[in-house]
């Protein structure tokens, strides 16, 4: 089932208001997938496992957890290399709705107030549920290519009908659709609203590369729970 989320993006930046101080939101489950290519965001679902979009399978990938600010260290920073990356078996450029992969970490993450797991949704989300769009953005002092600020935005889940009216929504199955009231002007805007969290569980991860405009597509995690659980249990050793 496709669902659509309507949200308001404040003018100027993706998720950040025009204030002198930017507040970092609480999202300790976010993992930054750092590479020499485009930025990507995943979610720590178990101590040794990160769930992420399959298109984030990039050379020289490193998983960053904890504090993401390069200029300020607080002891929560962790960089862990993957030892195995497992793409969803049906993923291809012609089947972008299956844009998921599991990353097994070389060692378990060390939990702290900025590093925590997020359970995955085992039921579908009902229309009208207010969910959180959680991702990474660039702080005002950050002129680099890597995001460093956790940001959250609330938005209600809408029905499948509106999603079907959009070109993006009608061409994806197992999807949640997001309609942005204002378009993104920033390159790599997808990392700012990379995940959908409903009732404190991971419900969606962005599909494909965000190409601008007012529609975002998310993989509905609920449809992939059997594959996620089977894979993470089989690969424990």
From Swiss-Prot:
Q: What is its main location?
A: cytoplasm
Return the protein name. Answer: Probable inactive serine protease 37
- Which family, according to the similarity comment? Belongs to the peptidase S1 family.
The entry's function note states: Plays a role in male fertility. May have a role in sperm migration or binding to zona-intact eggs. Involved in the activation of the proacrosin/acrosin system.
For molecular function, the Gene Ontology terms on record are: metal ion binding; serine-type endopeptidase activity
Q: According to its UniProt record, in which tissues is this protein expressed?
A: Testis-specific. Expressed in spermatids. Weakly expressed in mature sperm (at protein level).
Listed GO CC annotations: acrosomal vesicle; extracellular region
The consequence of inactivating this gene is: Mice exhibit male infertility, but their mating behavior, spermatogenesis, sperm morphology and motility remain unaffected. Male sperm migration from uterus into oviduct and zona-intact oocyte binding are impaired; however, sperm is still able to fertilize cumulus-intact oocytes. Male show an absence of mature ADAM3 in sperm.
Listed GO biological process terms = binding of sperm to zona pellucida; germ cell migration; positive regulation of acrosome reaction; positive regulation of fertilization; protein maturation; proteolysis; regulation of protein processing
Q: Does the keyword Hydrolase apply?
A: no
Instruction: Give all residue intervals belonging to the Peptidase S1 domain.
Output: 20-233
A Pfam match: Trypsin
Gene3D superfamilies recorded: Trypsin-like serine proteases
Q: Which InterPro entries match?
A: Peptidase_S1_PA (IPR009003), Peptidase_S1_PA_chymotrypsin (IPR043504), Trypsin_dom (IPR001254)
Give the species this sequence originates from: Mus musculus (Mouse)
**PROSITE patterns in alphabetical order:** TRYPSIN_DOM (PS50240)
| Keywords on record | Cytoplasmic vesicle, Disulfide bond, Fertilization, Metal-binding, Secreted, Signal
Cystine bridges: which residues? 40-56, 131-198, 163-177
- Localization of this protein: Cytoplasmic vesicle, Secretory vesicle, Acrosome; Secreted
């Amino acid at each position: 089932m496709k669902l659509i989320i309507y949200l308001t993006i404040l003018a100027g930046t993706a998720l950040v208001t025009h204030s002198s101080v930017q507040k970092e939101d609480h999202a300790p489950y976010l993992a930054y997938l750092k590479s020499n290519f485009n930025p990507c965001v995943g979610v720590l679902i178990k101590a040794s496992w990160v769930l992420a979009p399959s298109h984030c399978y990039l050379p020289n990938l490193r998983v960053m957890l904890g504090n993401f600010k390069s200029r300020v260290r607080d002891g929560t920073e962790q960089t862990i290399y993957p030892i195995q990356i497992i793409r969803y078996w049906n993923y291809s450029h012609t089947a972008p709705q299956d844009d998921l992969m599991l990353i097994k970490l070389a060692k378990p993450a060390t939990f702290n107030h900025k590093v925590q797991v997020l359970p995955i949704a085992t039921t579908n989300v009902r229309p009208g549920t207010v969910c959180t769009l959680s991702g990474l953005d660039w702080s005002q002092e950050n002129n680099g290519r890597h995001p460093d600020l956790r940001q959250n935005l609330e938005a209600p889940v809408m029905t499948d009908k509106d999603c079907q009216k959009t070109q993006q929504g009608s061409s994806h199955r197992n999807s949640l659709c997001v309609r942005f009231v204002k378009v993104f002007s920033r390159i790599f805007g997808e990392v700012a609203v990379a995940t959908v969290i409903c009732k404190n569980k991971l419900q969606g991860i962005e599909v494909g590369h965000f190409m601008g405009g007012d529609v975002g597509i998310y993989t509905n995690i609920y449809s992939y729970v059997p594959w996620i659980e089977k894979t993470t249990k089989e690969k424990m050793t």
